[in-house]
Amino acid sequence: YVGSMGRSAWYDSPINDFPLAATDTYNLVEHENGNDNGQGATLEAIDSFITSGQFGIESGTSFTFIDKVVPDLSFVGSTAGSPSVEMSLLASSEPGTADNNPASEGGVNEGQVALAVDMVDEYTDQLDVRVRGRQMAIKVQSTSLGTKWQLGTPRLNMRPDGRRGR
């Protein structure tokens, strides 16, 4: 449970298409319906993301180099005119080090090697990137109104790329 979604009662039955919940301000809200947050007077985008676990092609001293990504994303059901998401490749040089840019809160990110961020829309066939690191993770996120997306199986052109130096 992340964020604030105060609900005092829920109702879900096979008769209704979507579950209903009562808010702490005495409103009934239909859940799981639509692409945006319609609880307030105006629609708000729902910030959504998914981040993979870290992966690499070898353990030990080898780095991984990625130069192409086939995103495999679907935007079926979007109400936005041009739906898009941000796809990030997060690389780190050491296990357990922060992999985002800028440095993680409270410290220096000495393990960071590279970060690739590209916008992906329904017409994106492949991304040309240059990312090198010992371990990688993929993050896909959306903060736009009317954007509904589904991630399939992204394909990465990966290869070993030298040894880690000290």
What are these regions (language model features)?
Residues Y1-R166:
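Beta-sheet repeat architectures centered on beta-propellers
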